[in-house]
Amino acid sequence: MAKKQTAGRDRLGKLAPKFAELNDDVLFGEVWSREEQLSARDRSMITIAALFSAGLYPQLKSHLILGKEHGITKDEAIEIVTQLAFYCGWPKAWSTFPMIAEVYGEE
């Protein structure tokens, strides 16, 4: 079971409280918790791919961290990016590999 998400409220609670509520309670509270349909690890892989393809690097870094918590290894993260580079763009891979190095370190 995923831990309770509070990032929306922590970062946007005063500025956009309804958005923060939807982020924490619906997206992470309801969708991400449906582990019978997809594991948190699989959801992390899908989310990493989606954020990579859109070039949303701040969110991508956050989800690389979350993916690591969900069991995605450094080698798997590298392979995800290598695969996606051919479909989404080589420069995106170059932008993402330093994030992987930062998140995973020398593992």
Where are these regions (language model features)?
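Short acidic alpha-helix initiation/capping motifs at coil-to-helix transition points
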Residues: E21-D25, A54-K61
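Short alpha-helix boundary/capping elements
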Residues: A50-L56, C88-G89
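Acidic, glycine/proline-rich low-complexity segments that act as flexible tails and inter-domain linkers
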Residues: M1-R41, I65-E69, A93-E107
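Residues at the start of alpha-helices and the adjacent loop-to-helix junctions
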Residues: R41-D42, Q59
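Short basic/hydrophobic patches in alpha-helices and adjacent helix-turn junctions
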Residues: F52, L66-H70, Q83-F86
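Mid-chain, well-packed structural core segment of small domains
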Residues: P58-I78
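C-terminal structural segments of small proteins and small subunits
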Residues: I78-A101
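Short, structured motif recognition centered on aromatic/hydrophobic residues
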Residues: D42-L51, I80-V81
